[in-house]
Curated annotation (Swiss-Prot):
One of its GO terms (biological process) is translation. Belongs to the bacterial ribosomal protein bL19 family. This is Large ribosomal subunit protein bL19. GO terms for molecular function: structural constituent of ribosome. GO terms for cellular component: cytosolic large ribosomal subunit. This protein is located at the 30S-50S ribosomal subunit interface and may play a role in the structure and function of the aminoacyl-tRNA binding site.
Length: 116
């Protein structure tokens, strides 16, 4: 169990509004990229294959296919470089970690859309 002072400091740091998302969802993450002296936003769109809920240390992994090559990127949920996060579509999966998608390609790697 963590100290109450540490919990209070972590709660102050977790002030960012994060939409509800789960593994299998397609998300667009706006990432702050610094190039020289200027800063811009870069969109990283892909499928959430893993999510780690640990308060301030929460993280999620997004996978996309770029020019035929699989690219995975892990983001700290409350990191200052993550500007915004939006859910593009909801996926219907039955596992918490979708690491099996790494071995699949093309149409086999598709995820059913959740009907609400």
């Amino acid at each position: 169990m963590t100290n109450k002072i540490i919990q209070q400091i972590e709660a102050e740091q977790m002030n960012k509004e994060i939409p509800a998302f789960a593994p299998g969802d397609t998300v667009i993450v706006q990432v702050k990229v610094k190039e020289g002296d200027r800063q811009r936003l870069q969109a990283f769109e892909g499928v959430v294959i893993a999510k780690r809920n640990r308060g301030l240390n929460s993280a999620f992994t997004v996978r996309k296919i770029s020019n035929g090559v699989g690219v995975e990127r892990t983001f700290q949920t409350y990191s200052p470089i993550v500007d915004s996060l939006s859910v593009k579509r909801r996926g219907d999966v039955r596992k918490a970690k979708l690491y099996y998608l790494r071995a699949l390609s093309g149409k086999a790697a598709r995820i059913k859309e959740k009907l609400v």
